[in-house]
Amino acid sequence: MHRVMTIHPDIAPPPDLPAPAEPPAKVSPMMEQYHEIKAANPGLLLFYRMGDFYELFFEDAEIASRALGITLTKRGKHQGMDIPMCGVPVERSDDYLHRLIALGHRVAVCEQTEDPAAARARKSVVRRDVVRLITPGTLTEDTLLDARANNYLLAIARARGSSGTDRIGLAWIDISTGEFSVTECATGELSATLARINPNEAIVSDALYSDAELGPSLRELAAVTPLTRDVFDSATAERRLCDYFAVATMDGLAALSRLEAAAAAACVTYVDRTQLGKRPPLSPPSREATGATMAIDPATRANLELTRTLAGERRGSLLDAIDCTVTAAGSRLLAQRLAAPLTDAAAIARRLDAVEVFVVAPALREQIRSALRAAPDMARALARLSLGRGGPRDLASLRDGIVAADQGLQQLSQLTAPPQEIAAAMAALRRPSRDLCDELGRALADDLPLQKRDGGFVRDGYEAALDETRKLRDASRLVVAAMQARYADDTGVKGLKIRHNNVLGYFVEVTAQHGDRLMAPPLNATFIHRQTLAGQVRFTTAELGEIEAKIANAGDRALGLELEIFDRLAALIETAGEDLRAAAHAFALLDVATALAKLASDDNYVRPEVDQSLSFAIEGGRHPVVEQALKRAGEPFIANACDLSPGPAQASGQIWLLTGPNMAGKSTFLRQNALIALLAQTGSYVPAARARIGIVDRLFSRVGAADDLARGRSTFMVEMVETAAILNQATERALVILDEIGRGTATFDGLSIAWAAIEHLHEQNRCRALFATHYHELTALSAKLPRLFNATVRVKEWRGEVVFLHEVLPGSADRSYGIQVAKLAGLPASVVARAKSVLAKLEANDRGQPKALIDDLPLFAITARAPAEPSPPSEAEQLIAAVQALHPDELSPREALDALYALKAKLPKTT
């Protein structure tokens, strides 16, 4: 279920999220502060910092306890009722945030903004404020992100046109990498565009959210946030964009349409609000021209299992099968390309040129991949540092990235004439400053903490003042160690320890059995009781308090100096941000090129010819996912050809009508040709012996069966809706694959629909298409439609058994072998026998006489008949049984020879 977040004061919280509870007339200062902060952030779960915990109250606590499976307790009273409360440790908060975000919740993180000691001195509650709004589309932490997937925030703006010609502007950003894109489309193309972008969160105007036409489909997105209309105001869009990018005019940015600018401005406005004024570095918006990528509707993406299987898993998808990348950034770029295949033959050729370099030079390929393995995720490290969320390891990531850039350049220098994409990548790798790398190398210690607040990340000897402060701190700690030994001697408690935590500070700890000794005279004059636990008793001393103050002061000074150094290094990195981002993109590009080259070499893929023709000629085509599965099982994949190119004197592509039995491989053949076209336009080599493909502008797939009960649609209705979309939208350049159209209704209805659909594809759409069917009557259309070609999947029948050969040949099938497949599936023998009887009767009757057929066929006499006898075993089954009955270890040589002759005698006689 989607959830709606409102962060604008003009919009009331939606009904499915809790409104802030009204504060009573008299509450504690802490709860008064909580109510004030909660009222300013409606529609979000408030993580309210209390010491080492984030605590949630009222409805927030009830929601979080259910979502996270944590205990719901209570804290004080509100209007005479217990206040529900739950909490999570600060140090483990990322785990809990990840689970809440994955469930569609939004969170406001409220931190303590002063030291509790300062609040006590003021005799007031600790100051707190919201420092971050966490929403599904604005994540930056590695712990909250999928390393191999982009995390997009999408803004959608609409412009009303006359006669229903509305236009949609879209802008999407990934603040974790800085990517920023815009495009414009018609309302009819919105669903395909949304499926391609696959946003983690979408923002729309409240009017669009409530729109009768588009609202329902928008609300199906994983997370959608309605905002006030002014956020999408095109009149102020340019000013807001110029302000964000700190430029005087839009001249330096892409030439955006008014609608694209409105969506782009909405994006940066939302980022400003959720990041509370901290601006992540974004690339200037890149404008995607209309028609620049292959249009693929949501149903086709799902049916072809491009990035996820129908079960929602990455494993088993096309992306999983072809992803040989070694970096997270490379995996993200490959997924982007697979989601948006190009329609520009020249741009595709440039990508293929980059892959070919590493196909023909396997040694260089492996050298580059080795260098890439050392390249960290620089883009995301940069984003975290710019937002103040980075840590020492992010600094190290950028240092290591520059080192990897040098290694990559050294290897790529072997190329005397690198193709355009590789040359551009090499230029980008030269951009980062080597002086910056040296500075980071001098500053950073070898063993780095995750958080900068933990300290210890600056190398000894980097800064003299820090070294001196550390010596003072460490000397005080040696005093504590000596004090522990002295206290143990004075008390006679050899197990006495001096420990530290954030609540008590330094304290003396003994086991429970020794606690009474320290609380009794004369030791109680020195040891002051602080806390009793189940197995330990804790004390402090005046001397320990003095030492703690010295250690704290020295430690605080050391940490303060380290944080100053961190900020100084982060500022240097921000200055070099554009160069570092360019290098990060170059790493991703090289990773994709080398990964696709490895795939091509390992799996025997070939470079496709992609041009502006209407050709579609595949020789020895294979299904990339099925082939890998069969290879793991030690079985071969049967390759097949497919030629949908226009024939002599024909201006349009062909339609193949494919017949054959179930389980013969028709659906695999259909899908593999669609995937080959998609891979070719992605810029990948393809699983074939040869492939020539004229640009496909739209890809349609109507394969498989599924209902849509939520919308009240039956399986047949879903099939018809998808078929209607194909027949209404397919262009001459489209590639269409259709499987079993018309199967979900009465035979003659289904046959009629399939018949008419083929005629429409041939005469109106005039596109390249593959049409699989069990309606063998349709093969007669080839005599009437000149571009319709009959093909069949070859099978062999042997003594009542059917053998699937998976070979596609010219011709047509006259049988579907459904009963044989049913037998293989394990249907009871009596059912199989009865099915054969019914089939014989059906085939003997005139199918044009349904009344006579029904009267003649005793379908309702089953209950009056004796159960059918199981069919006798076939000769093949008898032969298998005879072999299974043999026990070779128990046979003498003579008996074994006799058994062999007996088996030979059972073989069917052949002429």
UniProtKB/Swiss-Prot annotation:
Residue numbers binding ATP: 660-667
PROSITE patterns listed in its UniProt record: DNA_MISMATCH_REPAIR_2
Pfam families registered for this protein in UniProt: MutS_I, MutS_II, MutS_III, MutS_IV, MutS_V
Biological-process GO terms, alphabetical: mismatch repair
Keywords, in A-Z order: ATP-binding, DNA damage, DNA repair, DNA-binding, Nucleotide-binding
One Gene Ontology cellular component: cytosol
Record carries keyword Protein transport: no
Keyword Ribonucleoprotein listed: no
Gene3D superfamilies: 1.10.1420.10, 6.10.140.430, DNA repair protein MutS, domain I, MutS, connector domain, P-loop containing nucleotide triphosphate hydrolases
UniProt function note: This protein is involved in the repair of mismatches in DNA. It is possible that it carries out the mismatch recognition step. This protein has a weak ATPase activity.
Protein name: DNA mismatch repair protein MutS
Organism: Rhodopseudomonas palustris (strain HaA2)
